[in-house]
């Protein structure tokens, strides 16, 4: 039977050296490894991951959040923060703050010839809408404790009339 110390440690602490990394590869632009750190913890409103981008690659598409706020802590390497239509240099030691809303679509790009390692920390607000300006898509997701999680990805131009399918 686990001790109270073991239980607390397992529910409160993650070490990046002990978590398994999952690779996201979608050529030609995306090649990242990541570990979700908050899964299995008692965290309720914060999420975190440890991310590694390969040279010349991105981890996710250019996007913005309607509800979630994000922070990135650059641990090793350098690259570019594409944000609000601008390209900003980033490097080891930088802490990046991205509030929700339409003013700060963002994407981290490894523009160097070595790996870029960083923490991604975010609030876990639901419901959430995420927009992708380059492709015109949106993601809407949410969940209620009494139902299955809800999620849909669509394009703005493919929407339905409010009354579609209603009696």
Predicted features and spans:
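Ligand-binding loop in jelly-roll beta-barrel domains
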Residues: 100-128
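Short, conserved beta-strand element in jelly-roll/cupin
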Residues: 50-55, 64-83, 121-125
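Short hydrophobic/aromatic patches on the structural cores and recognition surfaces of FHA
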Residues: 77, 93, 108
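Conserved short histidine dyad/triad with adjacent acidic residue
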Residues: 31-36, 49-65, 103
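Short acidic-glycine-tyrosine-enriched beta hairpin
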Residues: 85-100
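A short, N-terminal "cap"/entry segment at the start of jelly-roll beta-barrel domains
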Residues: 1-45, 131-167
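Short, conserved, surface-exposed binding loops centered on an aromatic residue
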Residues: 39-42, 52, 63-65, 73, ...
């Amino acid at each position: 039977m686990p001790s109270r110390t073991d239980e607390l440690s397992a529910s409160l602490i993650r070490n990046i050296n002990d978590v398994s990394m999952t690779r996201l590869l979608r050529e030609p632009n995306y090649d990242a490894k990541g570990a979700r750190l908050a899964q299995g913890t008692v965290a309720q409103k914060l999420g975190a991951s440890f991310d590694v981008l390969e040279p010349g690659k991105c981890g996710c598409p250019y996007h913005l959040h309607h509800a979630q706020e994000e922070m990135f802590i650059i641990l090793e390497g350098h690259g570019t923060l594409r944000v609000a239509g601008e390209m900003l240099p980033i490097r080891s030691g930088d802490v990046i703050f991205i509030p929700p809303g339409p003013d700060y679509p963002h994407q981290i790009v490894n523009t160097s010839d070595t790996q870029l390692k960083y923490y991604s920390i975010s609030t876990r607000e639901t419901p959430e809408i995420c927009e992708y300006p380059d492709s015109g898509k949106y993601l809407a997701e949410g969940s209620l404790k009494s139902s299955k999680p809800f999620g849909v990805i669509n394009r703005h131009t493919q929407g339905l009339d409010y009354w579609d399918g209603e009696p």
